[in-house]
């Protein structure tokens, strides 16, 4: 229990004790003893002349019998009581109520209101001076990081080497400022970490705290603003006063966009409290008073909404981008998290990194944890590559729906659909290496073919885009070849959407259409409120764009059809294997098409290593294929 809880409990116990004490004395004063009789018995004794004397105090009557015994009774409103007593020769003594009251009780009653007010005043004064902070709204909520517990250092941070290098310089400055001051350098006043969620901004701040060996205060941007006017500005002042008293030190503000948004844009219902808080922060960071030795590090994933005055040099001298890691960064991050679990030699961080493009550090940590949970649920002693693959598919596509009731007809159709994707991907030029194919339903998909690029692709050429379109259309083509045009299903809707997006990007953004040319078509400005941008393309040009998109998709469709028609036997073999095994790795598919057995010992041990064993001759691109077909027709 904290100090505030103990203080409230003490005051409550004292109040209850006083009330009980008051009741005890009041009861004792009213009854005066335990020999009580009813008023009817008292009147009977008076009429029988057995009562010698009575002492009346208010409505309480204390009587003495002729034999010397005493008794007590309580009298109602009885006007003839005195006449009845005198007529029966009873001696009467009337005592005022005040003379019988206990001295301590009288003192307590007279002084209790004053004592209560004094006690309440003392209680709140103690709280305002830091006892429980009942009224300390203006106190900063910045928490000083404790030295107890395991420290996080830069060794625990991987995949963001550039950001680590920038922040290491700040840590070195705090440790030995003379090294930089000899050359006239000044300590940076602020550093802003910018990046999407989960990339490690807060982890970097914790690593700085573990490396710097200086006081480290942490606070959230939402901790400044409350319902009371002026509280936010007061907390900012108190936070910087704490920093000055502990300089050199670091103050970390997480999610600074909660308090640092643009001023005067009319958002937030016209609340000026947040703007007052921001103004005070601007003054404290770079005003008339210097804050030597106090370094502000802030983190946000919304730099576009921050006020410009907050971003200028002198306040945040450095803006460090913490982006999602590339393939090498993902591999390093996976190795850091794999150290925390038990795994065997089949787990290859590089393969996992290739299959998780765009993953943040937090998502990779979650993937490793999911793999450990899956292995534990299956009763394994170590995590293997199968568990990592299952965890990756679960994160990307959802939980496997093995309980779904698929008919043999649907299962066969799905096998040919996914087999078409896989086969065209093997023969298509510039297509990424095939990783695996499965017909196990996950999420909204009945199956999946996964291709993993060797490295992260930041741009694509025409050949790569055309290959991707052909692979997208291959599932629909396989359904049409095997089951006929009238039996084609809606399962290829997402494939058609993906192919259309690539084709439209080729025409309107990449300038890869000879008819349209290298001209950008689309909105040249982004709307911060999420509204649909206006169309800047004429109707005539839009018709040409649609025609070009259709032409590119048709070429990819025909190219995929040529491959599947030419290798129809391999399509049947692959589809039958998928029906039997449900999931095949890229290596297993290559072994199958080359006539090798699927259940070799090496393949079962390392099913997802992607080691090439056979060479697949790539077909010509759609443009070259169309040209060759035209020449053969002319001949």
UniProtKB/Swiss-Prot annotation:
UniProt topological domain (Periplasmic) ranges: 28-103
GO BP term, example: proteolysis
Positions on the Cytoplasmic side per record topology: 1-6, 125-635
Region (Disordered): 600-635
Cofactor(s) it depends on: Zn(2+)
GO molecular function per UniProt: ATP binding; ATP hydrolysis activity; ATP-dependent peptidase activity; metalloendopeptidase activity; zinc ion binding
Organism: Rickettsia felis (strain ATCC VR-1525 / URRWXCal2) (Rickettsia azadi)
Record: active site: 418
E.C. number(s) listed in UniProt: 3.4.24.-
Pfam families reported in the protein's UniProt record: AAA, AAA_lid_3, FtsH_ext, Peptidase_M41
CDD domains: RecA-like_FtsH (cd19501)
UniProt: ATP binding residues: 195-202
Superkingdom classification of source: Bacteria
Protein name, UniProt field: ATP-dependent zinc metalloprotease FtsH
Amino acid composition bias (Basic and acidic residues), ranges on this chain: 615-635
